[in-house]
From Swiss-Prot:
UniProt keywords, alphabetically: Carbohydrate metabolism, Cytoplasm, Galactose metabolism, Nucleotidyltransferase, Transferase
Name of the gene: galT
Pathway: Carbohydrate metabolism; galactose metabolism
Protein family per UniProt: Belongs to the galactose-1-phosphate uridylyltransferase type 2 family.
Pfam families, A to Z: GalP_UDP_tr_C, GalP_UDP_transf
Listed name of the protein: Galactose-1-phosphate uridylyltransferase
GO biological process: galactose metabolic process
A single MF term (Gene Ontology): UDP-glucose:hexose-1-phosphate uridylyltransferase activity
Entry keyword Transferase: yes
Length: 493
């Protein structure tokens, strides 16, 4: 296919998705020719030959490279700017989204998600590189991923970034100002990034899809203002308010304290999507009567972390009950279990990771109790993956992992292959950090070429289960169960 046919097909897709109108076609073509380093044109078939936007993107990037129009280390920025030629303006997308919303929230999100994939805002090819498997436990089937989707920085890009003058704009990667931002140094390319403006409880928010999604239709609800995250009654109201607008999605928030929180605490945001997480499938271990909230049902979830599940048709009462649990947890201590609400200087250590969904006609809130205390034995966190597990997972346990989906580092792709070679007594370059674990596996089982891969994956799943147990404040033991009931009694006073 000729370069001009590729360009024409690219323009045809832009016409089809509403980026341009027929009267814009010549103008759009000329702008694109200049962008690709071309100054000529040959008439081609108007019938579309290639409908895959990513294949066309590759073809046009090859043209740009041949014409030397992409500066060293600028590939990511140029690629996003190229796809911006196929991405409707924010006003057009918002108009179409809310028009489709009149039919159903599902129609609106489907439109936006499909468009985000077409224009490479959601990087489907990178996401497809992730390694995924599951592991069955007594709590249900845990989901494990080795995250390979975020590409390693090219050395030229790293060198170029060092030469860029520091900028405070946008203030962070979650600010609305990222929409259409070309990119700069270590600030990602967002030329083709689009955000839906939405009002939740009278506040302005932005709704976008995550470029490197960790689960189906992984989306982010971000505050229009750059302000810190905070778990409080307003947060519960926001989660439930989002469900009123998008009942087809679940939504949750990272905790708002270091160690137990996510990687971005400086910008108020939540994460949503269409995925039935393992924790959502978990049954209740026991039910609880709430003395002060008769309209709210409650139970302890059968899960390695400490989770309360609240449900009600009454959104107002549900939010009040969640807030009551939060406030009581923020002052509750049980030092026999190393649970301590505050330091002597008043530093808070207790918060909640909340998750909201609609199930069987009721609003549901899962409240995961978090404690970020440290001590001499566990300087990274008492309720954080303990050192023996750091060879697999040492990062914070955030919202997604709390719900039973492990996001493991890319290094494990090659490191686990070396572990397999070690277990088969083959020449290997196994990282020393896996030695004790691999020795233990070797002593427990005989390995063959046919069984080693699945067995190592199962062992990784067991490590993730232990990670979640470490993060649980009330352990799944008789002592832990008794401690949990004492806390419930405190709440019911």
């Amino acid at each position: 296919m000729s370069i001009y046919q590729s360009i024409q097909d690219f323009i045809s897709l832009a016409l089809q998705n509403g980026t341009i109108e027929p009267l814009d076609e010549l103008y759009h073509r000329n702008q694109l020719l200049h962008f690709l380093g071309l100054n000529d044109w040959a008439e081609v078939d108007k019938e579309v030959h290639e409908t895959n936007s990513l294949i066309l993107m590759d073809q046009l990037l090859a043209i740009a490279n041949e014409n030397n129009v992409i500066a060293k280390g600028q590939d990511e920025f140029y690629e996003a700017a190229l796809m911006n030629f196929m991405t409707p303006r924010p006003s057009k997308i918002n108009h179409d989204f809310w028009e489709k919303y009149q039919a159903s929230p599902d129609a609106a999100t489907q439109y936006f998600y499909e468009l985000a994939q077409q224009v490479n805002q959601v990087k489907t090819r990178d996401i497809a590189r992730n390694i995924a498997f599951s592991h069955l436990t007594k709590y249900g089937k845990l989901e494990i991923t080795i995250n390979l989707s975020k590409p390693e920085k090219d050395p030229k890009a790293i060198a170029a970034a060092k030469l860029v003058k520091a900028s405070s704009y946008p203030a962070c990667q979650l600010c609305l100002e990222n929409e259409g931002f070309y990119g700069l140094g270590n600030k990602p390319a967002r030329s083709n990034h689009r955000i839906i403006q939405v009002s939740i409880n009278g506040e302005d928010w932005g709704f976008q899809y995550s470029p490197y999604a960790y689960f189906n239709e992984h989306s982010i609800l971000l505050n229009a203002k750059h302000q810190p995250m905070e778990i409080n009654k307003r947060a519960f109201d926001n989660l439930l308010g989002f469900l009123d607008k998008f009942p087809n999605y679940m939504i949750g928030s990272n905790a708002d304290l270091p160690i137990v929180g996510g990687s971005i605490l400086t910008h108020d945001h939540y994460q949503a999507g269409r995925h039935d997480f393992p924790m959502a499938k978990a049954e209740l271990r026991e039910t609880i009567e709430l003395a002060h909230f008769p309209e709210v049902s409650c139970g302890i979830v059968n899960w390695p972390m400490s989770v309360l599940r609240l449900a009600s048709e009454n959104q107002v009462e549900l939010s009040k009950a969640a807030d009551d649990f939060l406030k009581k947890w923020q002052v509750y201590s049980d030092e026999s279990l190393q649970i301590k609400a505050k330091s002597t200087d008043g530093t808070p250590h207790h918060t909640i990771t909340p998750i909201a969904r609609i199930r069987d006609g009721k609003y549901e809130l899962d409240l995961v109790l978090r404690d970020n205390n440290t001590n001499e034995k566990y300087p990274d966190g008492i309720f954080h993956p303990h050192p023996a597990l750091h060879h697999i997972k040492k990062e914070n346990i955030g919202l997604i992992e709390v719900m039973g989906l492990a996001i493991l580092p890319a290094r494990l792709e090659t490191e686990l292959l070396e572990v397999e070679r070690y277990l088969l007594n083959q020449d290997n370059q196994m990282n020393e950090i896996h030695k004790a674990w691999a020795e233990q596996l070797k002593n427990e089982e005989h390995f063959t070429r046919e069984t080693v891969h699945a067995t190592v994956q199962g062992a990784v799943g067991e490590v993730f289960e232990e990670v979640l147990k470490d993060a649980g404040v009330f352990k799944d033991t008789q002592e832990g169960h008794e401690g949990f009931r004492k806390f419930i009694d405190f709440v019911n006073q």
